[in-house]
């Protein structure tokens, strides 16, 4: 399985070295491209996938390295905030410790209804946060009743009423 960056570099180098020499392509690739540590981190998916459709907004993120109690989802103004935090732990080999913390923020589109935001964590560790959207500028329509106001007195009646008050 190759990452998008690796495919880009391979395509770029293929077009540059179009003579198809016998020199292996990986020998000219950056050193970090084949390091297993980076592939294990799954960098591409950890950033999340945004789904912005006409009637729905959703975000999916791989948070499989975190327990549900180590995650939080909140909305601050028009910003969706996902946080995860591991407390410092000693690694199993006893050579050191590890602590992980991330904060990922997404600006919510104007048409997202904040009160419809829901989050679900799958058994595979994929966090999905979704919300309904409404069309911008549309409001619920309603009829406004026309009520009869009390009859106003005529001009000569107004002066008689004013004289009586004085």
UniProtKB/Swiss-Prot annotation:
GO terms for cellular component: cytoplasm; nucleus. CDD domains: metazoan_ACD (cd06526). Residues 140-166 are annotated as: Disordered. Pfam families: HSP20. The keyword Lipid biosynthesis does not apply. Residues 38-149 form the sHSP domain. InterPro entries: A-crystallin/Hsp20_dom (IPR002068), Alpha-crystallin/sHSP_animal (IPR001436), HSP20-like_chaperone (IPR008978). Keywords: Stress response. One of its GO terms (biological process) is protein refolding. It comes from the Eukaryota. GO terms for molecular function: unfolded protein binding. The keyword Transit peptide does not apply. Belongs to the small heat shock protein (HSP20) family. This is Small heat shock protein OV25-2. It comes from Onchocerca volvulus.
